[in-house]
Regions:
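Anion (oxyanion) recognition and catalysis
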Residues: 2-3, 64, 92, 148, ...
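HAD-like small-molecule phosphatases
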Residues: 16-125, 195, 199-210
Length: 210
């Protein structure tokens, strides 16, 4: 993609150390938005920029008191279902300005207004790219704000139904194969021959056969 002159931005809910454990080629990207929009990472220089306030210590202390298992990034606090009710009550009781985002069983806590979409906007501003020129891929709850920011929103075949309903394109293939499916068309003719209705129909036919 980069030899074609296009920019590559990875937008993820993972913390950078966790991301590096599962994927060690972040240098392939111009920028990385990590922690669900809280952190901007520049692979060329290794520089990290926090895009929000760090988690309040009072909130972390309350989670420890309540024996909630969690991990902490520079801007994100993450735990898992079924702890969301305890987390929401802690936020309410403390009166801290935090919100909860779900991601396939993960429960992510961030400052209000911070999400993948706001992180992408920060990356695009740095790159000088309009959101109208962005093709984004998603599959989970935390991708709603992200895909809403993209000019062309793509949901892979294994994405949640609610995400598919709002996507411009739904791929035939799942996971990375679905991403590759669209990228091939993008490199070939900038998606000129990519008919969203055709791909949605393919998904409907696949469901009928099951």
């Amino acid at each position: 993609m980069r030899p074609s002159g296009r920019k590559l931005v990875l937008v993820t809910g993972r913390r950078l150390p966790d991301l590096n454990c599962v994927f060690d080629r972040l240098d392939l990207f111009d920028l990385v938005v990590a922690e669900n929009g809280a952190l901007l990472y520049r692979p060329d220089s290794g520089e990290e920029e926090l895009l929000c306030e760090p988690p309040p210590e009072t909130f972390l202390a309350r989670l420890r008191e309540l024996a909630v298992p969690f991990s902490v990034g520079q801007g994100i606090v993450a735990t898992w279902e079924p702890h969301q009710d305890v987390v929401l009550k802690a936020i309410h009781d403390l009166g801290v300005e935090l919100h909860v985002i779900f991601n396939k069983g993960a429960v992510m806590v961030l400052p209000s207004g911070v999400n993948k979409g706001t992180g992408l906007k920060a990356a695009l501003e740095e790159l000088g790219v309009s959101s109208h020129d962005v093709v984004g891929f998603g599959d989970a709850e935390n991708d709603h704000a992200f895909l809403a920011t993209c000019g062309c929103a793509v949901a892979v075949a294994n994405a949640l139904p609610a995400l598919k309903e709002r996507a411009d394109i739904v791929t035939r293939a799942t996971h990375g194969a679905g991403v590759a499916e669209v990228l091939q068309e993008l490199l070939k003719d900038d998606l000129a021959g990519f008919n969203p209705d055709t791909f949605r129909q393919a998904i409907l036919e696949s469901r009928k056969r099951k």
